[in-house]
């Protein structure tokens, strides 16, 4: 996986540079998400390895209908370098660079039960205060947490779940 990220990094940076230059962050995000989802399908991944599939056909297969010329050229460069399989990693790197440029922290809040909008607003305000950036929250529900929530911002994980607290208590009692 780390090798894929290393190989994808220059393409993620290039996509970001093109989008920044054109002021088209959102369309590039949408296009990369589409292409990454298609390329991530095992059947499509196998098809991309087929030498009978031409580069133009591969680009057509992976490009969203609304793709602009810059994006099609970008896919062509990936096809020329035989790096179309890296699209999921390229999309992830692009989103990371975009969030940095827009001063946004992406956080995933996983809780034992669905959270109210008021609770999410409170968490968003606390994270904004801590990181000094706007917060984009994605939610998930995992009943195995028993109670509480786990907040993952990529670099920082805050485990306030009952499951996590019990695990820490068990660890401290064992030692």
Swiss-Prot record:
Keywords: ATP synthesis, Cell inner membrane, Cell membrane, CF(1), Hydrogen ion transport, Ion transport, Membrane, Transport. Its main location: membrane. SUPFAM superfamilies: N-terminal domain of the delta subunit of the F1F0-ATP synthase. Gene3D superfamilies: N-terminal domain of the delta subunit of the F1F0-ATP synthase. It is a peripheral membrane protein. One of its GO terms (molecular function) is proton-transporting ATP synthase activity, rotational mechanism. It comes from the Bacteria. It is found in: Cell inner membrane. Signal peptide: none annotated. One of its GO terms (cellular component) is proton-transporting ATP synthase complex. InterPro entries: ATP_synth_OSCP/delta_N_sf, ATPase_OSCP/dsu. Belongs to the ATPase delta chain family. F-type ATPases have 2 components, F(1) - the catalytic core - and F(0) - the membrane proton channel. F(1) has five subunits: alpha(3), beta(3), gamma(1), delta(1), epsilon(1). F(0) has three main subunits: a(1), b(2) and c(10-14). The alpha and beta chains form an alternating ring which encloses part of the gamma chain. F(1) is attached to F(0) by a central stalk formed by the gamma and epsilon chains, while a peripheral stalk is formed by the delta and b chains. F(1)F(0) ATP synthase produces ATP from ADP in the presence of a proton or sodium gradient. F-type ATPases consist of two structural domains, F(1) containing the extramembraneous catalytic core and F(0) containing the membrane proton channel, linked together by a central stalk and a peripheral stalk. During catalysis, ATP synthesis in the catalytic domain of F(1) is coupled via a rotary mechanism of the central stalk subunits to proton translocation. This is ATP synthase subunit delta. It comes from Xanthomonas oryzae pv. oryzae (strain KACC10331 / KXO85). The gene is atpH.
């Amino acid at each position: 996986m780390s090798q894929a990220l290393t190989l994808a990094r220059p393409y993620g940076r290039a996509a970001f540079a093109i989008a920044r230059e054109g002021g088209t962050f959102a369309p590039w995000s949408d296009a990369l998400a589409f292409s990454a989802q298609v390329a991530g399908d095992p059947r499509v991944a196998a098809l991309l390895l087929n030498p009978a599939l031409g580069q133009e056909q591969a680009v057509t297969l992976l490009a969203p209908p609304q793709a602009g010329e810059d994006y099609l050229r970008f896919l062509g460069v990936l096809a020329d370098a035989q790096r179309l399989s890296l699209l999921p990693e390229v999309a992830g790197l692009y989103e990371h660079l975009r969030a940095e440029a827009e001063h946004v922290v992406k956080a995933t809040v996983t809780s034992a039960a669905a959270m109210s909008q008021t609770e999410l607003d409170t968490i968003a305000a606390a994270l904004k205060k801590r990181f000094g950036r706007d917060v984009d929250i994605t939610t998930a529900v995992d009943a195995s947490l028993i109670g509480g929530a786990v907040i993952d911002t990529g670099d920082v994980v805050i485990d306030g779940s009952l499951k996590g607290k019990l695990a820490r208590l068990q660890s401290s009692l064992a030692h």
